Amino acid sequence: MSKKPADGRKVIATNRKARHNYSIIDVYEAGVQLVGTEVKTLREGKASLVDAFATVDDGEVWLRGVHIPQYDHGTWTNHAPLRNRKLLLHRAQIDMLVGKTRDGNLTLVPLSLYFLDGKVKVELALARGKQAHDKRQDIAKRDASREITRELGRRAKGM
């Protein structure tokens, strides 16, 4: 099953590559409009955000590319695994996202999918894609900071 931190969130799936491939500018929380068998599958902890993204079409935000497999015990009422799912946001948030995604090279990327008080939520990031050299710089910074903390630890121990 999934982990449940102290804030009441039960994380179902995370997009682990999102922070590597994108520079996160802003983060939003949105509800997800689901059918019954999708909720049952999510309660089992089965979902994938690997190729997922969100788009704004006709004043509505849609989550695309999220794979929620069919419910094992479902019948003919089962859902399509890769169907588009509507995200539930306030009108002001949608209007702001429309303006920001239209202006520049920004995209909407889901970071995680989780339960909050029994409702499925998605953590949606407004992000800009990273180039290969940006990724290399981030890795170099991370390695340098890791080396510094390691050296400080050695000095504190008196080695």
Curated annotation (Swiss-Prot):
UniProt record, GO biological process: trans-translation
Gene Ontology annotations for the cellular component aspect, listed alphabetically: cytosol
Statement: the UniProt record of this protein carries the keyword Cytoplasm: yes
CDD domains: SmpB
Family: Belongs to the SmpB family.
SUPFAM superfamilies linked: Small protein B (SmpB) (SSF74982)
Keywords: Cytoplasm, RNA-binding
One MF annotation (Gene Ontology) recorded for this entry: RNA binding
Protein name: SsrA-binding protein
Function: Required for rescue of stalled ribosomes mediated by trans-translation. Binds to transfer-messenger RNA (tmRNA), required for stable association of tmRNA with ribosomes. tmRNA and SmpB together mimic tRNA shape, replacing the anticodon stem-loop with SmpB. tmRNA is encoded by the ssrA gene; the 2 termini fold to resemble tRNA(Ala) and it encodes a 'tag peptide', a short internal open reading frame. During trans-translation Ala-aminoacylated tmRNA acts like a tRNA, entering the A-site of stalled ribosomes, displacing the stalled mRNA.
PANTHER family in UniProt: SSRA-BINDING PROTEIN, TMRNA-BINDING COMPONENT OF TRANS-TRANSLATION TAGGING COMPLEX
Name of a matching Pfam family: SmpB
Highest taxon listed in the record's lineage: Bacteria
Gene name of the record: smpB
